[in-house]
Amino acid sequence: MKKFWKTVCAVALVGMVVLPVQAEEKTITVGTMSWEDLTPITGITKKVLENAGYTVKVVEFSEIGIAYAALTKGDVQVLASQTDYATQDYWNKNKNRLEKLSPVSYGLYQAIAVPKYVDIDSLDQLNDNADKFSGKIIGIEPGSGLMSDANKAVKDYGFKLQLLEGSTAAMTAALKSAVDRKEWVAVTIWEPSWMAQKFDLKFLKDPKGSFAPPQAYYWIGHKGFSAEYPHAREVMASVYVPLADITAINGAVKDGKTMDQAVAGWADNHADLMKRWANIKQ
């Protein structure tokens, strides 16, 4: 009997096939928006992944809806986004096909701001000073999360001022023109932004809570990314870029550097940190 079972076991062992563990892919396609708060995050994370042995391709989008569509289809594999408020609608619509990987920064705030020489401090003071603002609030691109909140504020506060839709470039030009003349101006703006520092702005208090509170930035991926790229996910989860550093990188860009040069300068100044991030163990 013992010989019989030994024979059976031997045959079974011969018939077993040991399947090799599938190696993790080393090429990752990263999506990014051409926004000043997201491009530094993307650039730094790209460098860390490259230092960890990955080949990283970056695809830039001009519309957040297109970026989310590309992520759900797998045209890009990861994307940095503010899923709690700024892009919440897109996240909620697609979250069954996506996964949240890790937080990468915190503190985004979007609201209405004025130069510090303007002697009001709250949104509920705008109506009493509408004439000083020429009856308008200078907005940015329609359809953005910031403009959605700004339209909510118009209703919540019953603003007599008109919220003007336009572009970030047009808003910046109007802001610069007003500040150069020390005129009163109200704009929709965000932090981190070089503009908040350059033009010495202050956010107006929002007692009715029309605007979202400070928001986190997350790396999000298509469904299954963590399983397909377990080590890359761990590397990305180690990366955290403080808001002040994002602002500093954009300040360097405003002073004439390219984004790649500004990110490279930041990386050189944080070489030990970059090395620790890249060498994170799975």
Each model region followed by its residue ranges:
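Bacterial N-terminal signal peptides that target proteins for export
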Residues: 1-9
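Ligand-binding pocket segment of bilobal, Venus flytrap-like solute-binding proteins
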Residues: 70, 76-80, 142-209
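Pocket-flanking alpha-helical
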Residues: 42, 59-97, 173-174, 194-200
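Ligand-binding cleft/hinge of the Venus flytrap
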Residues: 45-53, 130-163, 268
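A bilobed periplasmic-binding-protein/Venus flytrap-type ligand-binding module shared by bacterial periplasmic
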Residues: 109-119, 215-228
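Extracytoplasmic "Venus flytrap"
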Residues: 27-43, 62-64
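A conserved helix-loop-strand patch within extracytoplasmic ligand-binding domains
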Residues: 96-146
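Sec/Tat signal peptide C-region and signal peptidase I cleavage site
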Residues: 18-23
